[in-house]
């Protein structure tokens, strides 16, 4: 998802019930079960396996209830992706490293390897994120902000500046495009690692390395 597509208008946005919209523990638990069911189905069969009726059955909720929480499978999968990034972000720790370059390389490597360990799930979440329309703009924006914040945290121990957030956004876009290239077998895992390393060195390094 490019920066421009991330910022599309949300004039036709459909309502997904997030954690903050749920008043009872039972509702929050139901939402968790729905997302857990979505991840389990996607992990076994990819994007096509995530059907609303199958999710409802696995989560033990009525189909009508599922639609009140998530209007479509795209909303489901993008929300599941957001939850995965929230889990990483909630740890609240900067990755080890002597400087921003080392920390950024480490966090990119960790996230990329985690995604590559479950290619069907990654394909499903990434496909939904890439092709979400304006109705899922709020969910897409949430994922984008989580990625930007996660990568910006590698650059500073304090609140990131606008410049740092801009760099993080570039890295987010490069990371996502390379993840898609790996999923579609246009790039190997080694190719992805090399490109990400070069990107980080060009943006955060001392300028000594140039692309060959």
From Swiss-Prot:
Biased composition (Low complexity): 1-11
Keyword Transcription regulation: yes
DNA-binding region: 51-70
Gene Ontology MF annotations: DNA-binding transcription factor activity; transcription cis-regulatory region binding
GO biological process entries: regulation of DNA-templated transcription
Pfam families: TetR_C_20, TetR_N
Covalent S-S links between cysteines: none
Domain HTH tetR-type: 28-88
Key words, A-Z: DNA-binding, Repressor, Transcription, Transcription regulation
Region of interest (Disordered), residue spans: 1-28
NCBIfam families per the UniProt record, alphabetical: transcr_KstR
PANTHER family: HTH-TYPE TRANSCRIPTIONAL REGULATOR RUTR, HTH-TYPE TRANSCRIPTIONAL REPRESSOR KSTR
Subunit (UniProt): Homodimer.
Protein name: HTH-type transcriptional repressor KstR
Source species: Rhodococcus jostii (strain RHA1)
GN (gene name): kstR
């Amino acid at each position: 998802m490019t920066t421009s597509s991330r910022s599309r208008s949300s004039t036709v946005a459909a309502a997904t019930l997030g954690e903050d919209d749920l008043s009872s523990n039972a509702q929050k638990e139901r939402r968790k079960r729905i997302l857990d069911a979505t991840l389990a189905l996607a992990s076994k069969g990819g994007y096509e396996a995530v059907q609303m009726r199958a999710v409802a059955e696995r989560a033990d909720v009525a189909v009508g209830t599922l639609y009140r929480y998530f209007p479509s499978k795209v909303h489901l999968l993008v929300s599941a992706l957001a939850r995965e990034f929230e889990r990483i972000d909630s740890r609240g720790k900067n990755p080890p490293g002597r400087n921003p370059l080392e920390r950024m390389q480490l966090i990119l490597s960790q996230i990329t390897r985690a995604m590559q360990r479950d290619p069907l799930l990654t394909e499903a979440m990434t496909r939904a994120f890439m092709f979400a329309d304006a109705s899922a703009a709020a969910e897409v924006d949430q994922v984008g902000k989580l990625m930007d914040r996660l990568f910006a945290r590698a650059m500073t121990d304090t609140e990131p500046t606008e410049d740092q957030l801009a760099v993080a956004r570039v890295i987010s876009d490069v990371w996502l495009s390379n993840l898609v290239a790996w999923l579609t077998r246009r790039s190997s895992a080694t190719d992805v690692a090399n490109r990400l390393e070069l990107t980080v060195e060009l943006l955060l390094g001392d300028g000594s390395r140039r692309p060959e």
